[in-house]
A protein has these predicted regions:
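Hydrophobic h-region of N-terminal signal peptides that target proteins for export
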Residues: 1-7
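N-terminal catalytic scaffold of extracellular/periplasmic and nuclease hydrolases
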Residues: 8-193, 197-198, 302-308
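Beta-strand elements within well-structured catalytic alpha/beta cores of enzymes
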Residues: 12-22, 104, 202, 246-254, ...
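Active-site His/acidic residue clusters
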Residues: 122-127, 206-222, 243-246, 250-279
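Phosphate/oxyanion-binding active-site loops and adjacent basic polyanion-contact surfaces
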Residues: 133, 224-232, 271-275
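Active-site regions of oxyanion-processing enzymes, predominantly non-cytosolic
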Residues: 185, 189-202, 231-254
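Surface-exposed beta-loop-beta
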Residues: 193-236, 260
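Metal-dependent active-site segment of extracytoplasmic phospho-/sulfohydrolases and closely related
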Residues: 276-308
Length: 308
């Protein structure tokens, strides 16, 4: 499933939203719930379900009919099939392949890669990393820095320190040395954005103590928690102030998948709504730049076989 708002001609601003684990059934289930909240039977369409163009995307892996987020993400990011678990390389686990984000950067656009889970998780990593195993979190973090994109956001790194390499600097130090400003939470981002050349937006240390693997589920959100809508708003703000030929921004709603793995319909629905809220930020931007903006919303795979 892919839903698209098209620019007239070549797009200057490209938004790529990925609902991890989000198939047609997650979207339809959410819309059915929203109608019920309104007191009626039927569906209440999400903003992106009303986009003028709809298509299909296949993300089966190079070796399996059932894909995973690494192979599926690589398919979406590069247009190539690979083995389950591999990121940014072909099925031979050797040949590196560049993502659309890397190509956008090489053509002079500002680039952002963002997620509601950790910045080194499979889907965001598909856009910048080249590893044979999605669990190589420290190396993925190093690839994030090496890619040199302008804006990254997520909960945190999963393995900022590599215990196998004694004396190796942690990823935060490496980020700062590479010119990144690290912001903790949306309020901190607002304080630091103007003077930053490149930005890494993470959740607060307080939130990390509860769960560093992701920002909270939308259904569990507390005041001042970082949200996917905050992340998207910050990314648009930051990339727009760069003196470049437009930008490319990937935004992942990563916990739709997690909720479906847990058979948690309530969290699935609320995180799908959270993704739609993030898309609304792009829609608002597109209204100001109607002839130059492309918005694409898709999923890397469906999770859980959700049925109604």
């Amino acid at each position: 499933m892919a839903l698209v708002v098209m620019a007239e001609g070549k797009a200057k601003y490209v938004f790529y939203f990925i609902g991890d684990g989000m198939g047609v059934n997650q979207v339809n289930g959410t819309e059915t719930y929203m109608a019920a909240v309104e007191g009626r039977i039927g569906t209440s369409p999400l903003c992106f379900a009303q986009f003028p163009y709809v298509g299909l995307v296949t993300t089966y892996s190079g070796t399996n009919g059932v894909t995973d987020s690494a192979a599926g993400g690589t398919a979406l990011a590069t247009g190539n099939k690979t083995k389950n678990g591999a990121l940014g390389i072909k099925s031979d686990l050797t040949t590196r392949i560049n993502s659309i984000a890397a190509l956008a950067k090489s053509e002079g656009k500002a680039v952002g890669v963002t997620t509601s889970v950790s910045v080194d998780h499979a889907t965001p990593a598909s856009f910048y990393a080249h590893v044979k195993d999605r669990n190589m979190y420290h190396q993925i973090g190093k690839d994030l820095i090496a890619a040199g994109f302008d804006f990254y956001a997520g909960s945190d790194f999963l393995q900022p320190e590599n215990n196998e390499l004694s004396g190796n600097k942690d990823l935060y130090t490496q980020c700062r040395e590479a010119g990144y400003t690290i912001a903790r939470g949306y309020a901190d981002y607002r304080k630091k954005a103007k003077k930053a050349d490149k930005m890494l937006l993470l959740q607060t240390e307080t939130a990390n103590k509860a769960d560093r693997t992701s920002i909270p589920y939308a259904i569990d959100r507390q005041k001042n928690d970082l949200t996917l809508q905050d992340i998207t708003r910050a990314a648009i703000h930051f990339l727009s102030q760069k003196d470049t030929d437009g930008f490319f921004l990937m935004v992942e709603g990563g916990k739709i998948d997690w909720a479906c793995h847990a058979n948690d319909a309530g969290s699935t629905i609320n995180d799908t709504i959270a993704l739609a809220d993030a898309v609304e930020e792009a829609v608002a931007f597109a209204k100001k730049h109607p002839d130059d903006t492309l918005i694409l919303v898709t999923g890397d795979h469906e999770t859980g076989g959700l049925t109604i």
